Structure formats: structure tokens, C-alpha cells
């Protein structure tokens, strides 16, 4: 009877240690993920300093001026 109890106690202690180990690993992984999010996210701009306006993008294709009399085509 005493051996069954000691085996049960050792099993419960092993399961408890396993649970603690897994929970610590999950917490460590979440902390790393949060740290990476902070590093990759852009800094929060200060409301006192306005950001400069973004210039419009350049045109994609160069269209030369028309050489025809009607103004259409090349």
C-alpha cells in the first residue's frame, strides 16, 4: 500500500514539474513575441510635432509630348 502511494506521489510531482516547465516555456515565448512586436512596430509620433506631408508618387510611365497635328498619337 505504501509503495502505491509513493508511486502516486512521484507521478503527481512529475506531472506538476512538467506543467510548470511547459507554462514557463509558453510565457517565455509570449514575452519574446511581444518584444519583437515592439521592435518592429513604428514609433508613435508625437502629437506636438506634425509629420511632413507625403509627396505624391512619381508617374509610372513617361509619356512624351505628341508630335502629330491633332494632338493624338506619336
From Swiss-Prot:
A motif (SCOOP motif) lies at residues 60-74. Brassicaceae-specific phytocytokine (plant endogenous peptide released into the apoplast) perceived by MIK2 in a BAK1/SERK3 and SERK4 coreceptors-dependent manner, that modulates various physiological and antimicrobial processes including growth prevention and reactive oxygen species (ROS) response regulation. Belongs to the serine rich endogenous peptide (SCOOP) phytocytokine family. Residues 42-62 have a biased composition (Pro residues). One of its GO terms (cellular component) is apoplast. It comes from the Eukaryota. GO terms for molecular function: LRR domain binding; receptor serine/threonine kinase binding. It comes from Arabidopsis thaliana. The gene is PROSCOOP16. The keyword Membrane applies. Its main location: membrane. Interacts with MIK2 (via extracellular leucine-rich repeat domain); this interaction triggers the formation of complex between MIK2 and the BAK1/SERK3 and SERK4 coreceptors, and subsequent BAK1 activation by phosphorylation. A motif (SxS motif essential for MIK2 binding) lies at residues 66-68. Keywords: Apoplast, Cell membrane, Cleavage on pair of basic residues, Membrane, Secreted, Signal. Residues 29-74 are annotated as: Disordered. It is found in: Cell membrane; Secreted, Extracellular space, Apoplast. This is Serine rich endogenous peptide 16. Residues 1-31 form the signal peptide.
Amino acid at each position: 500500500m505504501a509503495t502505491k502511494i509513493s508511486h502516486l506521489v512521484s507521478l503527481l510531482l512529475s506531472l506538476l514539474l512538467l506543467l510548470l516547465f511547459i507554462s514557463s516555456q509558453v510565457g517565455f515565448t509570449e514575452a519574446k513575441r511581444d518584444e519583437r512586436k515592439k521592435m518592429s512596430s513604428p514609433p508613435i509620433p508625437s502629437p506636438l510635432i506634425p509629420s511632413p506631408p507625403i509627396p505624391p508618387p512619381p508617374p509610372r510611365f513617361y509619356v512624351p509630348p505628341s508630335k502629330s497635328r491633332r494632338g493624338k498619337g506619336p
